[in-house]
Curated annotation (Swiss-Prot):
The gene is VhaAC39-1. Subunit of the V0 complex of vacuolar(H+)-ATPase (V-ATPase), a multisubunit enzyme composed of a peripheral complex (V1) that hydrolyzes ATP and a membrane integral complex (V0) that translocates protons. V-ATPase is responsible for acidifying a variety of intracellular compartments in eukaryotic cells, thus providing most of the energy required for transport processes in the vacuolar system. May play a role in coupling of proton transport and ATP hydrolysis. Keywords: Hydrogen ion transport, Ion transport, Transport. This is V-type proton ATPase subunit d 1. One of its GO terms (biological process) is vacuolar transport.
């Protein structure tokens, strides 16, 4: 072990070992082959008991529902993540906090949307992601105007730097809520990328690769989703995160694109993205571009575990488990609806 590894282990060795232990419990292909053969959700529960999920559904009464399975999967993952966060010291604690900011943005957008539509806060809070919860989250419901809402977000959340630089009070009233979400996410991704880059070493190597892909994926999806809408090319370009492999030339080309084929042409200049477009389609049996993006993300997250003494494993583990949760919920939906034709359309991890 080199000296940097020794120093890393003093503060972070236990948690990295714990995270790698959690990773060993991720479902293998053999587990999925068992799950897709289930006839009922009770069968599914039985098969999951034989994995690291154990008796996480033991206290749930029959008949089981997919939404209960979804909630319990998320609950288990949140407990694992929060356990690691509670035992972390700086700078790992800062890194883990950064991960939660993405969920916080989604929660803030949910609360802003609900507040502007006069929805009761008691109805909105349960829909928020627990990893993105923050102190005084319920205080936001006191805000009755966009200005009060804006100030509540600035005072009560760590997202203030992302808001101050790119969103004004007027924007909450006038700007499309999805534009606000993407503007915040651009600022967040760029800040997270710079944080990881400044850490240097294996953390920078692993995380900058993962976050660069996330930035490019968002730019591509924003472009495709903008076709046929009122969003101008200039406004669209302002939403692109500037920390991916497509920055700056690829993003400039994306900003000029008028249709899906032109986006595909831009992607062809980047080998890994060209492969994702080539392998996707909208015909029966084809994988969607979104599925191909998820597959590539899984590959990057699995690669993160090939190096030691870095923080990327914590991010990668969370993302792999989220994909696993989506897989289980997909299979559960197919079983519950007796719609087996597409039951194999999950994203394998190992």
């Amino acid at each position: 072990m080199n000296s940097s590894g020794f120093m890393f282990n003093i503060d972070n060795g236990y948690l990295e070992g714990l995270c790698r232990g959690f990773k060993c419990g991720i479902l293998k292909q053999a587990d999925y082959l068992n799950l897709v053969q289930c006839e009922t959700l009770e069968d599914l529960k039985l098969h999951l008991q034989g994995t690291d999920y154990g008796s996480f559904l033991a206290n749930e009464p029959s008949p089981l529902s997919v939404s209960v399975i979804d909630d319990k999967l998320r609950e288990k993952l949140v407990i694992e993540f929060q356990h690691m966060r509670n035992h972390a010291v700086e700078p790992l604690s800062n890194f883990l906090d950064f991960i939660t900011y993405g969920y916080m943005i989604d929660n803030i957008i949910l609360l802003i949307t609900g507040t502007l539509h006069q929805r009761p806060i008691s109805e909105l809070i349960p829909k928020c992601h627990p990893l993105g919860s923050f102190e005084q989250m319920e205080a936001i419901h006191v805000a009755s105007t966009p200005a009060e809402l804006y100030n509540a977000v600035l005072v009560d959340t760590p997202l203030a730097p992302f808001f101050v630089d790119c969103i004004s009070e007027q924007d909450l009233d006038e700007m499309n809520i999805e534009i606000i979400r993407n503007t915040l996410y651009k600022a967040y991704l760029e800040a997270f990328y710079n944080f990881c880059k400044n850490m240097g070493g294996a953390t920078a190597d692993v995380m900058c690769e993962i976050l660069a892909f996330e930035a490019d994926r968002r730019a591509i999806i924003i472009t495709i989703n903008s076709f046929g809408t009122e969003l101008s090319k200039d406004d669209r370009a302002k939403l692109y995160p500037n920390c991916g492999k497509m920055y700056p030339d690829g993003l400039a080309a994306l900003a000029r694109a008028d249709d899906y084929e032109q986006v595909k042409t831009v992607a062809e200049y980047y080998a890994e993205y060209a492969a994702l477009f080539d392998g996707s389609g909208n015909n029966p049996g084809d994988k969607t571009l979104e599925d191909k993006f998820f597959e590539h993300e899984v590959k990057l997250d699995v690669y993160a575990f090939l190096q030691q003494f870095h923080f990327g494993v914590f991010y990668a583990y969370l993302k792999l488990k989220e994909q696993e949760c989506r897989n289980i919920v997909w299979i559960a939906e197919c079983v519950a609806q007796k719609h087996r034709a597409k039951i194999d359309n999950y994203i394998p991890i190992f």
